[in-house]
Amino acid sequence: MSRVVALVLCLLAPPVCGAAEFSVTPIRLYFEPGTRSAAVTVTNEDKRPLRMQLRLMQWTQDADGADVYTDSDALVYFPRLMSVQPGEKRLVRIGLKTPAGAAERTFRLYLDELPDPADAASPPAHSGLNFTIRFALPVFLPAAAAAKPSGAIEALTLRDGKLRVAVRNTGNRHFRIANVAVRAGEAFAAEAPGWYLLAGASRIHTIDIPAGVCRGLRRLDVTVKAEELSLQGGLDVEPGMCAP
């Protein structure tokens, strides 16, 4: 969905909620090969003005596959501060500074709602919380060479009833894992949620297998389901691999 709905946060909050409602299109920005610029549309769907600040962060992943964000000026983007009136749309333009590299480069463009100065000047008489919205737009810059998703299950281990599935992105572009599914015939089935796996990164997904179930298993079949690829693996189970 392209819509950032502040109403959800308001329903979870006490009577006062200061967050605006707006939409961002697209929700993921892909630069096509040879493209030097792109645009994002922000629509104010609220009844009051929307003030926003924009900030670019480089998006990488560490040795464990955890997301790491650092300030970046690798792209040109404007405006960096903007006001959007109710019902209006504003374009955010993004441009490249340098040519494509050997691997895809990934960023997040943060669109932060700024508090309404009137709210700060005149606090509500009744108690409550004021929320603002942050939207993190993924931005993908393609590699110079043809990009094709490629991955591998590096390792499958079962120890003390914990199945660990190590997945590596062996390609030059990201892919998004939908889930990691494990099955043992009709005896056991489970899934672990997935996430983005950037080029060259790896992540371990863990699935717990109950001790009583684990001891009756002979083999586990694992499938890593991603948007554009599927990886399969298997592991023979021995009782000593299960939780005591």
Where are these regions (language model features)?
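Beta-sheet-dominated interaction scaffolds and their linkers
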Residues: A19-E45, L81, A145-D160, G194-Y196
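Terminal connector regions
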Residues: K97-P142, A146, G212-P244
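Bacterial N-terminal signal peptides that target proteins for export
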Residues: M1-A6
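Short aromatic-acidic-glycine turn motif
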Residues: Q58-D71, P117-A118, R183-E191
